[in-house]
Amino acid sequence: MSSFHQNSSYMEDADYPGYSGSRNHTHNYLETQDYPEFPGSQNNPGFHHPRSNPHSSGSRTNPDYPYFQEEPDYPGSLSNTVYQDTRSHPFSAHSRTRPDYESSIEPDYNDFRSESYHAGLPMEPDYPGSQSHPGFAGVGRSSMNYTGPRTNLGYLGSLEEPDYPGAQDNSYYHSGSRPHSNLPGSRRDAGYAGSRINSYPDDLGEPDYPGAENQPNSPRFYGKPDYPGAEEGDGYSSSKSLAVIRRGNGPFGMLGRRNEDYPEGIGMVSMEMAGDPRNGYVNPAYTRRISPVCPDRNLLLCAHDWHTSVQGQKLIASLIPMTTRDRIKTIRNQPRTMQEKRELRKIVDKEKNKQSHGILEANCCAQCLGSLSLTYRRTRNGLSELLNYITLWQKRFKVIGGKFGTSVLSYFSFLRWLLKFNIFSFVMNFSFIIIPQFTVGAKNTLQFTGLEFFTGAGYFGDTVMYYGFYTNSTIRHRMGGASYNMQLAYIFTIGACLVVCFFSLLFSMAKYFRNNFINPHIYSRGIAKLIFCWDFTVTHEKAVKLKQKNLSTEIRENLSELRQENYRLTFNQQLTRFSAHVAAWLVSTGVTAACCVAVYYLAEYNSEFLKTHRNPGAVLLLPFVVSCINLAVPRFYSMFRLVERYEIPRQEVYVLLVRNIFLKISIVGILCYYWLNIVALSGEECWETLIGQDIYRLLLMDFVFSLADSLLGEFLRRLIGMKFTSLSLQEFDIARNVLELIYAQTLTWLGIFFCPLLPFIQMITLFIMFYVKNVSLMMNFQPPSKAWRASQMITFFIFLLFFPSFTGVLCTLAITIWRLKPSADCGPFRGLPSFIQSIYSWIDTLSRRPGYLWVVWIYQNLIGSVHFFFILTLIVLIITYLYWQITEGRKVMIRLLHEQIINEGKDKMFLIEKLTKLQDMEKRVNPSALDLERREVEPQIPLHLEELGAAPDLRLRRSAQEENPIA
């Protein structure tokens, strides 16, 4: 029956001697490989109508047979003349060729799939239970009002659209137009024998039960041999198995070839439900609605039975002898889902434990070490995920980066990086300096007026905020107990903070340099990340929009870099640009020099004025002027872009950064010169506290100006841009804002010796400035008009912070500690000739104790030796040069490898073109060979691909039958 629908004859029957699937064509069909010869078999010589008997009257090989090799001759066959109900008999009551035959070519059961009814065709079976049997329930199909045909507009499943659950055009589940799911004849009626829920794709080859994907172990489809021993039979483990008798429970019984008592009842298509447990075959779609199916039988591992397949067992066997690291790496590289990888790892571990059960004691230490290593990795990964989750401002960073790009985001990243420095410095100072001082500090008797917040003097002068409040005595709480030397604690704590900052800056520069300068994205530009980086776990609408903005911004940055590489200037344009750059540098340098001179003379004048006038507000004059200069001059520098016209935004930012840092560091350098040569030598009572108060006022005034500029200045600029459309909205000035951070951090490091609480003040200002800048950015600024990647900006920011800011601070503090004399009446170093003298005294004390002579040797030969520092500096320079050469070599190697990849791609394209030309030439010379090769390839098409084209093929076949019923 199955082959009939495909070929309109029984030529493809597995019983036929010329059948292509027969394994023994030369030894008669009786000797076909492993075919059972049960009683009643057509191949049984005792059977009275064996088709293999050439002298049988009904044999198809008998030349006298009227339908020689055309029609099957088993009882009930279409051409069997003795069969009463044969449809080929012109006078049979149920013959389709009879003039008064009611039924058409198409089956007339209620779940009939045809689009119209037609005249009868003598090639359709009409035995009882047949789809075309006239006694079938319902009116004949010759009636146009028949409720079953799909040409009836009232029929629920008309026009050949699948109406089973999950169908794409099933309106029953959406619009409710198919309310009767159990209507007799409906394909959704599971109890009906011809229902399409039947997994055996007898009805036009496509099962429609829920979740059906043509299970590989299900009974065979039409056109494929399904008897035991068939070559393509997946459902049978042996070719020598007995005949599979499928019992039926249809409403009309199982007559004809479906009857198990019938001689040819082998491998016939059953009308029974696939999920009926009595059959022994349980459809996975009913037991597991979403069972993964492996449509391709040649895959390495199938989703549901990968561990039982040969390939799966080989993979498991190859993973067992591997080390833990190699096994994890191999499993990670498998093209499987995470769930399948976990299951594979569990199976391998289980098998490995079984094999290693006998040598468990010998490998106990190795297993313990492996368990500890695994626990350590998991703990480290968990802590890393936790730190990433609780990282400060992580969500806000994503929003900023998505809307304004990495260039603007670099400012906020730098701000957060500076905040970490100040938190560390504050914790160190608070733990080792401030807390011990609280235990011995005297009560402050000065009155607090509120003006101290701006001036830093008055009430704050007699607190732990400034250097002059700290004691110079050794703290002891009881006689004979432990002592705490405040001089050593003060200088070692400040020194430790600066040393940690020094190495942190070095390592940070090295890390960012490695990530941003030695980067394969220089050549690939991260195109793969842009294409494959979408996170399908993101379902929230707001998060999806943010992700889209991030991707669009990165694409714009990539395109901008590509345009910049292809941009070239003529000689005249280059000469004009060079002249503009030189003029801008000359003007900016002159403005910086003028500002430095003005600040120096203002500081001297203000000092003389304060000696004669005790006005508390007069101390704010110098910080106010310096802050005005820092606010106005960088904006003046920003106007140079109209003349210089940089095509690459990164170059413009770098130039502005250098000009602004030169301005700010020059002003700070002039102030340091003023403090160390004027204030420190003026004979003031506590000059260290005065310097600390000046630095506090500068830092506070800079914060106030930045706050006012963000809340008022940028807001007014936005209103002006909205009023005058020619000006448009402003863009975030990265160079100016970053220089404000560098300037403030330089003052913090410079004043940490004179004002130990200055890191705490800077920490508060940075925290407030982040939120203020964030709000101002979202309200008052537009995204950069020229998108550009700022991956190297953080490295440049840290470099500017290290040099000249941090190195300048170290030089200033070194001069203070080694050259200047402390105040005689305040501070922990009072009465000493220099600050470093406290270290000398401590070393002399240790030299008289035999147990601490190693400390004395280290100080005298390493720390206090000029030769040691010279050798150390030379070693550092040599190592730096070597690493620089290694870096350059890696850059060259990366470039060569990139070129090699490009050349290999070109070679492959060349070979593909050559192969295509050769195939075209061979096709023109010998087209028959290609047709033969195509025929050999077509049977290898996967089953699920055949099913996709099955329904259209049947429709075309029915159309041909309609046009020529006799054919």
From Swiss-Prot:
Residues 1-10, 21-31, 53-62, 168-184 have a biased composition (Polar residues). InterPro entries: TMC, TMC_dom. It comes from the Eukaryota. Residues 442-449, 509-581, 638-660, 716-749, 818-861 are cytoplasmic. Pfam families: TMC. It is found in: Membrane. Residues 1-240 are annotated as: Disordered. It is a multi-pass membrane protein. GO terms for cellular component: plasma membrane. The chain crosses the membrane at residues 421-441, 450-470, 488-508, 582-602, 617-637, 661-681, 695-715, 750-770, 797-817, 862-882. Ubiquitously expressed. Residues 1-420, 471-487, 603-616, 682-694, 771-796, 883-967 are extracellular. Keywords: Membrane, Transmembrane, Transmembrane helix. Belongs to the TMC family. Probable component of an ion channel. Molecular function hasn't been characterized yet. This is Transmembrane channel-like protein 5.
